[in-house]
Amino acid sequence: MALLYITTAALALLLLFLRAVFKSWRIQRKLPPGPPGLPLIGNIHQIPAVRAHQKFTEWAKVYGGLYTFRIGPATAAVITDRGLVKELLDKRSALYSSRPVSYVGQNLITGGDHLLLMDNNEMWRLFRKTVHQHFKASMCEKEHVKLLEAEHTQMMRDFLLYPEKHMLHTKRTTNSIIMSLLYGIRTPSWDTPHMRELYEIMEQWSKVMETGATPPVDIFPWLRWIPQRWLGNWVDRSVEVGSGMKALYGSFRRRAIEARREAEQSSQSRARTFIDHVLDLQEKANLTDNQVDFLGGVMMEGGSDTGSTMLLVMIQALVRYPEVQERARAELDAVCGEGRSPTWADFSRLPYINMIVKETMRWRPVTPLSFPHALNQDDWVNGYLLPKGTTVFLNVWGLHHDESIFPNPERFDPSHYEGRHNLASDYAASPDYMQRDHFIYGAGRRLCPGIHLSERSMFIGAAKLLWCFQFEPEMDESGRPVAIDTDPITGYTEGFLVCPQAYKCKVSPRSTARAETIMREFAQAESEVLCQYATP
């Protein structure tokens, strides 16, 4: 009798297994074709732990602008076609704006309160609305541009006085901008403690959240029960990142609360910042401290990293392609002369500077693989099925290095954007997908809410650096130029945020008159704008 029960149970399990295999086979027949995988595990063995965007781009050249692969029983799709980005992520954004479940990101690190990882729900929409109100285009024009110009003026002064610290000046600048707008606290120098802490945390965060960097526990939950030391200590690494984030972000919330209390007790007025609006919202919407911390934290992360990295990439390109500097200088000199540095008001008269900014974003994007979307219901695309729950990757690297759109894509060539002189937000909203300049800000409802601030900051920073400085290769002991490594594999860091490895270059002012202008403008910026913000 016992043997009969065992046999019956075994047959039942076999039937269930065969049914699951048959169902999976039927679904796979309807999917967009992609690289063949193995039974049960799919393509897990083919996905590298670092720089997955390179593999995804390699597959796109074989399987086209939309293909799928399997991560165990789960389906993933990769979009490397700008027409499909517009059709799916933009026009069908209601279907494609969810996020995949991430045990590492949501449970171990952020507690589910990080805007980048949150699903498309009421809290996510409330957070997006709050960010938009403070960083929309009109607010940037009316309130934030004066700070952008003042901080980038200090950046010029820092490059002038400490040219050997060029890897730190852009980081200080962008961190100080976002810290001032979020919390009313500047980052006056490159060795300010909160700046060092943030960039250390972000480096760890970037590595642990890169596709393939941790075990696929969302697909195979049983992996959580395997001793983590056998799998790279992924739990400890994740928890350490989360602890660092919570400690740093929480410290700024507590400081803001204390500043509000002191101002109230002394009846003194103080400028309201983003955190003041969030703290007001906390009372109305019953937000937790963790939600408040990560709403400020996500803006701190995005505001600190993207702009600083892109300016460092631009300097790499200027050293390698000096002819770009020559054309930029001619444009800047015709508009500004030597007596003043460029400002945001010069935007329409400096189209080539805007082209340089766009080409920088395209050439070495800081996010070569956008954070994945998730499909919240079945969808049919060109006769193929994308089932509910599919993880959807926007392959930014592949889109930016598409030879049919950008001839000779490995060359830094601002003429790729000849005739496209509007801001990235305009092209992201355009119905003509061929006009889209780049995809560094994402797409659809997940478009970066800081796009308006970032665009203005990047232009101002690029214009001021090019107006004042000459960027050249460093010379070795024999007097030969030392080439900067811009190879996509060896020249940049690992992680979902990709930054240049430390490099050397020669930075020199273009003239004594320009150096004097920098110091005069910095003194004015310090006395009129920068002094309004607290320092640590």
UniProtKB/Swiss-Prot annotation:
GO terms for cellular component: membrane. It holds the Pfam family p450. Its EC number is 1.-.-.-. Heme binds at C448. Pathway: Secondary metabolite biosynthesis; terpenoid biosynthesis. InterPro entries: Cyt_P450, Cyt_P450_E_grp-I, Cyt_P450_sf, Cytochrome_P450_fung. Gene3D superfamilies: Cytochrome P450 (1.10.630.10). It comes from the Eukaryota. One of its GO terms (biological process) is terpenoid biosynthetic process. Disulfide bonds: none annotated. The macrophorins cluster contains a single gene insertion (encoding for the terpene cyclase macJ) compared with the yanuthone cluster that produces the linear compound yanuthone. This is Cytochrome P450 monooxygenase macC. It comes from Penicillium terrestre. The gene is macC.
